[in-house]
Amino acid sequence: MDKVVIITGGSRGIGAETALLAAREGYRICINYHSDEKAAHGVLEQVRALGAQAIAVRADVSSEDEVIALFHHVDAELGRVTALVNNAGTVAHKSRVDEMSEFRILNILKTNVLGPILCAKHAVLRMSPKHGGQGGSIVN
């Protein structure tokens, strides 16, 4: 089975390290990022230096339209997804909970809760034998 992974929040930290590990394990890799294109392309260069086929794709995982576009891009460039690492997340930096706006709270929930569910939904639509897939793995 071909190994294709999407790593959300793949431009730094745990996501970047996961991309490097996936490269060593022979995966074709999509490094998803939300805002730091420069960091994502830095990870992309490192992954490619290890011999992996890889792309960097900007998408806001809290938007189903953007998640759909992300998965379609990966389908076209790398093939059917066989693994998903839901790593993207956001926190309330320098905010006290009693000072957080409803907008900020909803943004955190959309990214950290809705995002992984949307990504898992679209991964399962590709991985599940019910939908023509051959199985796969999702890491949350």
PLM region descriptions:
Residues 25-42:
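Conserved glycine-rich Rossmann-like NAD(P)H-binding loop of the short-chain dehydrogenase/reductase
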Residues 11-13:
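Conserved glycine-rich cofactor-binding loop
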Residues 37, 58-70, 102:
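The beta1-alpha1 cofactor-binding region of Rossmann-like NAD(H)/NADP(H)-dependent oxidoreductases
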Residues 95-97, 104-109:
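Substrate-binding pocket helix/loop in short-chain dehydrogenase/reductase
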Residues 50-53, 73-84, 93:
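A glycine-rich helix->loop->beta "capping" turn
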Residues 3, 52-53, 80-81, 127-140:
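Active-site loop of short-chain dehydrogenase/reductase
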Residues 120-121:
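A short, exposed helix-loop element centered on a Lys and neighboring polar residues
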